[in-house]
Amino acid sequence: LPMWKTVEEVENFLRTVAGKCKTTLLLETREAVECLDEVLKHGDMDEIHIGLNDLHLSYGLDFMFELLSNGIVEKIVKKIKRTGIPYGFGGIARLGCGDLPAERIIMEHYRLGSSRVILSRSFCNNDLISDLSEVENVFRNNMRLLREYEDTVSKMPDSEFVSNQAEIEKIVEKIVKMKRRKR
């Protein structure tokens, strides 16, 4: 269910689906964050994805990853985590890419207990590749690199995640300042 804003919208959605298929709530609005406690009491959804792009716009922020640096995502996932409902957030670029490097975002996924993510277009941009077999090769290679990095991250000590969180705050602040100067 995308762009929901009220408990009633979620209730109607879950009642309509009635267990016929897997349900995912896309938490993408400020209003959804504000009524999340009530929505989570229902517990009938299969998973929740926090959509950073629409959510940052809903909050009037300049950069979607401000939601990581300002604590909003952490506040949301703490609530979801208590319910046991699987969750994830945002999207990631391929390793070595992104205004905020994908490696840093992946570390935040691990720190926050996320179990799912959407891959951004830059992960495998099929607009730049016309040969379907080449798209498949690029995707497969990027997935292999991602899984290898995940394995490395899964073995990191907590201190690495604390350092990463602080570095994300610095990088996001710098990006936001640049965006505001361009206005």
What residue spans do the PLM features occupy?
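Ligand/cofactor pocket segment of small-molecule handling proteins
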Residues: K22, T29-V33, H42-N53, S58-Y59
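Active-site-adjacent structural elements that line small-molecule/cofactor binding pockets in enzymes
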Residues: I50-N53, E66-S69, K78-K81, I85-P101, ...
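Hydrophobic faces of well-ordered beta-strands that scaffold small-molecule active sites
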Residues: L1, T23-E28, I48-I50, Y87-G91, ...
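Catalytic cores of alpha/beta
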Residues: E9, R30-G43, A93-S114
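Active-site-adjacent beta->alpha loops and helix N-cap segments on the catalytic face
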Residues: L1-G19, A32-C35, L57-I76, G98, ...
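C-terminal helical cap(s) of enzyme catalytic domains, especially alpha/beta-barrels
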Residues: G60-S69, Y110, F123-R180
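Alpha-helix-loop-beta-strand connector modules within alpha/beta enzyme cores
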Residues: V10-T24, L67-G90, R140-D158
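Single conserved hydrophobic/aromatic residue that forms the stacking wall/gate
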Residues: R183
